[in-house]
Amino acid sequence: MAVPARHTSSAKKNRRRTHYKLTAPTVTFDETTGDYRHSHRVSLKGYYKGRKVRDDTK
């Protein structure tokens, strides 16, 4: 079984972990529906870039 040749110090470990971050989701206000939605996604009411692209009638 492989074993590390040197002990990883806490400073080295913490420097490596500085890049493990959570990013906030990009949420924009949709002028057409008045709701918030993710960027580059169809809104829940079926609008994208101000146009109706999905019909919800079933």
Curated annotation (Swiss-Prot):
It holds the Pfam family Ribosomal_L32p. Keywords: Ribonucleoprotein, Ribosomal protein. The keyword Ribosomal protein applies. One of its GO terms (molecular function) is structural constituent of ribosome. One of its GO terms (cellular component) is large ribosomal subunit. It comes from the Bacteria. GO terms for biological process: translation. Residues 1-23 are annotated as: Disordered. Residues 9-20 have a biased composition (Basic residues). Belongs to the bacterial ribosomal protein bL32 family. This is Large ribosomal subunit protein bL32. It comes from Lactococcus lactis subsp. cremoris. The lineage of its organism: Bacteria, Bacillati, Bacillota, Bacilli, Lactobacillales.
